[in-house]
Amino acid sequence: MNYIGTWVFHSIATMNDKDEIVFLSAEEYMKAPMPYVDETDEEAVADELRERKRMVSTHLKVCTDGKLYMLSPLPEGVPQEEVDKAVAAGIITLVDGMMTDRPLMWEERDGDLWYDTGIEGELFGEKTDSWVKAIDDEGFFIFATTRFVKA
């Protein structure tokens, strides 16, 4: 499989009422209950909806140079002049017109895409590997709790 290119949001994992993991499409996620948000607080609900919209608009970009970028849309209503100043000051980085943090590294191992999460630690006294296999058996790119498909 050719992994190079842009991957777009497909679905996000959440728990249903039976404590089972289910994946919600963008539309389902935007309409899903907000159990951890006071839904009587309009500002909190608006913040959560903005965050959800940002999440479903996120892309992953797998580049030929071994870099993997998580791309987020610019906040709505920010003037281009302000964006240009933030870029010039090094506050944000843009790739394909979207914001990104430092890239992660990726490599192919036995035909599979692996990426370095950058998360290091120990499990039962043994050092854990920060590299994870990206593509699941269904062909989705798994990044944390989110599934992406090749655009």
Specify the residue positions occupied by each region the protein language model found:
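Contiguous, well-ordered beta-strand patches that form the walls/edges
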Residues: 12-18, 42-150
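Surface-exposed strand-loop-strand hairpins of Gram-negative outer-membrane beta-barrel proteins
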Residues: 19-36, 44, 48-50
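N-terminal helix-cap/turn-to-beta initiation motif at the start of protein domains
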Residues: 1-8
